[in-house]
UniProtKB/Swiss-Prot annotation:
TM region(s), chain numbering: none
Domain spans labelled FIP-RBD: 572-634
Gene name linked to the record: Rab11fip4
Name of the protein described by the UniProt record: Rab11 family-interacting protein 4
Region (Disordered): 147-176, 216-258
Cellular component aspect of the GO annotation: cleavage furrow; endocytic vesicle; endosome; Golgi apparatus; midbody; perinuclear region of cytoplasm; recycling endosome membrane
Organism: Mus musculus (Mouse)
GO biological process: cell division; neural retina development; positive regulation of G1 to G0 transition; regulation of cytokinesis
Pfam families (alphabetical): Rab11-FIP3 (PF25450), RBD-FIP (PF09457)
Length: 635
C-alpha cells in the first residue's frame, strides 16, 4: 500500500513520457517485427554525438548484446540514463503482479490513438531526471490519514475512496495501462475482464444506474475475478484491502486523491476499451460502498437486513431521477434474490475480514510485545556495548600508557646507546686520524729506510768489490810471499855455497898460512894473510849468523801473517755471508717489522759496516808495516 502511495501521481506523466518514447522508437525506424536494430541506433547516434557516447547509449539500450532492441528495453535504457531506473522497476513490479490476459470475447480491445493533448490535466512533462518528484509529493500530501466521516446513507456514491479502494483502483488502472504500453501494436492490451457490454457512449446513462444494478454487476464480476478460489494475480492486493477493512486504525497511505483519479479517468479514456472503463467505474463504486461501510460501523458486523434496507433506500433514491424510474422499478423485483445472495456473500466476507482484523490485531499486539522485548533487549545490548566500549577504552588507554612507557624507555636506551656510539665513533675517528698521521710518518720513514738501505746496499756492493780486490791482493801477496820464499831459499843456498866457498877458501888460506910459516919472510906475510883470513872468516860467520836470524824472523813473520790472514779471511767471510743474508731479507723485515726493530736492524748494519772499515784499515796498516811493496800497483 505504501508503494502505491509513493508513485500515485506518476502514471499520468509516465504515460506521456512512454508515448513520446514510442514516437521516438517509431521515428528511429523499427523493423516490421517490432524490434529496432542496434546498427540503426548507432548510425543515428554518430550524427549527433561522439563515439564513446554512442557506445554507452548502445550499451544501455542493449545490455545483453542481442543486436536488436524492443520497446521495453528501449524505455528501460532511457530511464536508466535519466536516473529513473528505480521508478521503472517499481512500475514493472506492479505490472508483473497485477496484469491479466485480455479476454478473448472482447473484440474492440485495441490501443487507442497515440495523439495526446498536453492540456488534459494541466500537467507538463518535466525534462529533468526526477520528473515524477512533484507528482509524488502532491500524492503524499493529499494521501494524509483522515478520520471516519459522518456520511449520509442515501449518498454512498459521493463518499471518498478508502485506502483499500484506492490501492485496488490504482492497481486496476495502472497495471493494464503500463502493460499495454510495452506491447507491440499488433497485440491486445492487458486489461481486466468485465461482464458488461455497454459502450463508452453510454457512460452518462451508466452513471445513473442504481446502486443495486451496480452491485449486481460487481457481484457477477466478482464471481469471475475476485472469488476466494479464483487464481487471480491481484489476490495479495485484495487480501491487504480486506484485512484493512476490519482494522480500527484508519490508514490512507495508499489513498488516491479525487483530482488524481479524475486525471487517471481522463487519461485512460484514450487507452482503455469501453468494457474496461465500465469495469473501472464499477470498481470505484464498490470502493465508495466499502468506505461508507467502514465509516458508519468500523468495529461491528453489519447485518444482511440493515445492509439490504440501505441498498433499497439508495435504490429508491436513485430511481426518482427522470425517465429511468420505471426501468429501475422493474429491475428491483428481478434482482432481489441476487442482491440477497450478494449481501450474504459480502456479509461472509466482512465476517472473514473482521476475523482477519482480530487476528491481525492479536498479531499486532504480539508483535508490539515482541517489539518491546526486542527494544529492551536492544537497550540491554546497547548498555553491554557501552560497558564493553568503556572497558575496551580503558584497556586501550592502559595499553597505550604501557606502550608509551616502553617507548620512552626504549627512547632513553636508544639515546644512551647513540651517545656511546657517537663517543666511540669520535674515538675511532681520532685513532683513525692518529693512524693516518702515523702511517704517513711511517711511509716517510720507510722511504728514508729504503734510501738508507739502498745506500747500504751500494756500500755493501762497494765493500764486496773492495773485499774482492783484497782477496785478489791477498792472492798476489801469497804469490809474492811464495816467490820471496823461493828467493830466500835461493839466497840461502847461495849463502851456503858462499859459506862453503869461504870455508874452502879459509882452509886454503890456513894451508897457505902453514906453508908460509915455513919460510921466514914468507912466514910474516903468511901470518898477516892468515890473520886477515881469520878476520874474514869471523865476519862471514857473523854474517851467516845474522842471516840465519833474519831468516828465522822472516819465517816467524811469514807464519804469523799467514795465520792472521787465514783467521781474518774466515771471520770476514762469515761476517760477509751474514751481512748478505740480512741484506737480502731487509725488504721483508721492513714490511713486517716495527719501527723499533727497523732502527735496531739499521744500527746493527751500521755497526757491521764500521767493523768492516776497521778490518780493512787494520789489514792495510799490517801490510804497510810488514811488506809495503804488496800495496804497490804494478803495471
Amino acid at each position: 500500500m505504501a508503494g502505491g502511495a509513493g508513485w500515485a501521481g506518476a502514471p499520468a506523466a509516465l504515460l506521456r513520457s512512454v508515448r513520446r518514447l514510442r514516437e521516438v522508437f517509431e521515428v528511429c525506424g523499427r523493423d516490421p517485427d517490432g524490434f529496432l536494430r542496434v546498427e540503426r541506433v548507432a548510425a543515428l547516434g554518430l550524427r549527433f554525438g561522439q563515439g564513446e557516447e554512442v557506445e554507452k547509449l548502445v550499451k544501455c539500450l542493449d545490455p545483453n548484446d542481442l543486436g536488436r532492441i524492443n520497446f521495453k528495453d528501449f524505455c528501460r535504457g532511457v530511464f536508466a540514463m535519466k536516473g529513473c531506473e528505480e521508478l521503472l522497476k517499481d512500475v514493472l513490479s506492479v505490472e508483473s503482479a497485477g496484469t491479466l490476459p485480455c479476454s478473448p470475447d472482447i473484440p474492440d480491445c485495441v490501443e487507442q490513438g497515440s495523439d495526446f493533448s498536453g492540456s488534459t490535466d494541466g500537467e507538463q512533462l518535466p525534462r529533468e531526471p526526477d520528473f515524477f518528484q512533484e507528482d509524488e509529493e502532491e500524492a503524499m500530501t493529499l494521501a494524509l490519514p483522515e478520520g471516519p466521516q459522518e456520511l449520509d446513507m442515501d449518498s454512498p456514491m459521493e463518499s471518498s475512496q478508502g485506502p483499500e479502494g484506492s490501492v485496488k483502483g490504482c492497481g486496476e488502472e495502472k497495471e493494464p495501462e503500463l502493460g499495454g504500453l510495452f506491447l507491440p501494436e499488433d497485440k491486445c492490451l492487458v486489461l481486466t475482464p468485465s461482464v458488461t457490454t455497454s459502450d463508452l457512449s453510454t457512460h452518462s446513462t451508466a452513471s445513473l444506474i442504481s446502486n443495486e444494478e451496480q452491485f449486481e454487476d460487481y457481484g457477477e464480476g466478482d464471481d469471475v475475478d475476485c472469488a476466494p478460489s479464483s487464481p487471480c494475480p491481484d489476490d495479495e492486493t485484495r487480501t491487504n484491502v480486506y484485512s484493512d477493512l476490519g482494522s480500527s486504525v484508519s490508514s490512507s497511505a495508499g489513498q488516491t486523491p479525487r483530482k488524481m483519479r479524475h486525471a487517471y479517468n481522463s487519461e485512460l479514456l484514450d487507452v482503455y476499451c469501453s468494457q474496461c472503463c465500465k469495469k473501472i467505474n464499477l470498481l470505484n463504486d464498490l470502493e465508495a460502498r466499502l468506505k461508507n461501510l467502514k465509516a458508519n460501523s468500523p468495529n461491528r458486523k453489519i447485518s444482511s437486513t440493515a445492509f439490504g434496507r440501505q441498498l433499497m433506500h439508495n435504490s429508491n433514491f436513485s430511481s426518482s431521477n427522470g425517465s429511468t424510474e420505471d426501468l429501475f422499478r422493474d429491475s428491483i423485483d428481478s434482482c432481489d434474490n441476487d442482491i440477497t445472495e450478494k449481501v450474504s456473500f459480502l456479509e461472509k466476507k466482512v465476517t472473514e475480514l473482521e476475523n482477519d482484523s482480530l487476528t491481525s490485531g492479536g498479531l499486532k499486539s504480539k508483535l508490539k510485545q515482541e517489539n518491546m522485548q526486542l527494544v529492551h533487549r536492544v537497550h540491554e545490548l546497547e548498555e553491554m556495548v557501552k560497558d564493553q566500549e568503556t572497558t575496551a577504552e580503558q584497556a586501550l588507554e592502559e595499553e597505550a600508557r604501557r606502550h608509551r612507557e616502553v617507548y620512552c624507555k626504549l627512547e632513553r636506551e636508544k639515546s644512551t646507546e647513540l651517545e656511546l656510539l657517537n663517543t666511540r665513533v669520535q674515538q675511532l675517528e681520532e685513532e683513525n686520524t692518529d693512524l693516518r698521521t702515523t702511517v704517513a710518518r711511517l711511509k716517510s720513514q720507510t722511504e728514508k729506510l729504503d734510501e738508507e738501505r739502498q745506500r747500504m746496499s751500494d756500500r755493501l756492493e762497494d765493500t764486496s768489490l773492495r773485499l774482492k780486490d783484497e782477496m785478489d791482493l791477498y792472492k798476489r801477496m801469497m804469490d809474492k810471499l811464495r816467490q820471496n820464499r823461493l828467493e830466500f831459499q835461493k839466497e840461502r843456498e847461495a849463502t851456503q855455497e858462499l859459506i862453503e866457498d869461504l870455508r874452502r877458501e879459509l882452509e886454503h888460506l890456513q894451508m897457505y898460512k902453514l906453508d908460509c910459516e915455513r919460510p921466514g919472510r914468507g912466514r910474516s906475510s903468511s901470518g898477516l894473510g892468515e890473520f886477515n883470513a881469520r878476520a874474514r872468516e869471523v865476519e862471514l860467520e857473523h854474517e851467516v849468523k845474522r842471516l840465519k836470524q833474519e831468516n828465522h824472523k822472516l819465517r816467524d813473520q811469514n807464519d804469523d801473517l799467514n795465520g792472521q790472514i787465514l783467521s781474518l779471511s774466515l771471520y770476514e767471510a762469515k761476517n760477509l755471508f751474514a751481512t748478505q743474508t740480512k741484506a737480502q731479507s731487509l725488504a721483508a723485515e721492513i714490511d713486517t717489522a716495527s719501527r723499533d726493530e727497523l732502527m735496531e736492524a739499521l744500527k746493527e748494519q751500521e755497526e757491521i759496516n764500521f767493523r768492516l772499515r776497521q778490518y780493512m784499515d787494520k789489514i792495510i796498516l799490517a801490510i804497510l808495516d810488514h811488506n809495503p811493496s804488496i800495496l804497490e800497483i804494478k803495471h
